Design a protein with these regions (language model features):
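Amphipathic interaction/junction segments at domain boundaries or subunit interfaces
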Residues: 1-82
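Short, hydrophobic/π-rich interface segment
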Residues: 55-115
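Short beta-strand-to-coil "C-cap" segments at the C-terminal boundary of structured domains/repeats
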Residues: 124-129
Length: 129
């Protein structure tokens, strides 16, 4: 836990990192949706053994999220499994919450492949939502 806090603190204080990842408005920009849908479609072709395979979930007016992803195959889990350190994958998953927080996003997730879920469900909304 102590190392995780050090890593988190380092990211929060890095201005370049903030510029690269953006904020809630840039991440949830509807103009990016067509590109994300294309990425999702192409992921299902499974061109690369250890790549991600995902579905894009659009939040509706009654949902508490704006954008969602269901990952059915995870490159990080695959890499950790191949390298004999699968138990580390669940700790890498925690970084998703750090990154979401840095962008002023609310991330909700109920399961991950790293913790024996059937898929990883990411649901992003604005913290103020």
């Amino acid at each position: 836990e102590e190392c995780f806090s050090l890593y988190k603190d380092g990211l929060y204080n890095n201005k370049l990192f903030h510029m690269v990842i953006g904020n809630a408005d840039s991440y949830l920009d509807e103009k990016k949706l067509p590109g994300r849908k294309k990425w999702s479609e192409e992921s299902h072709l499974r061109r690369y053994k250890n790549d991600w395979v995902l579905d894009i979930i659009e939040g509706g007016p009654n949902d508490d999220f704006v954008l969602g992803y269901d990952y059915h195959n995870c490159g990080i889990c695959n890499l950790c499994r191949d390298e004999g350190c699968f138990e580390l994958a669940k700790y890498l998953c925690r970084m998703d919450f750090v990154l979401a927080d840095m962008m002023d996003l609310k991330l909700t997730r109920t399961q991950t492949l790293a913790e024996n879920g059937t898929y990883c469900d990411f649901r992003y909304g604005r913290k103020s939502q």
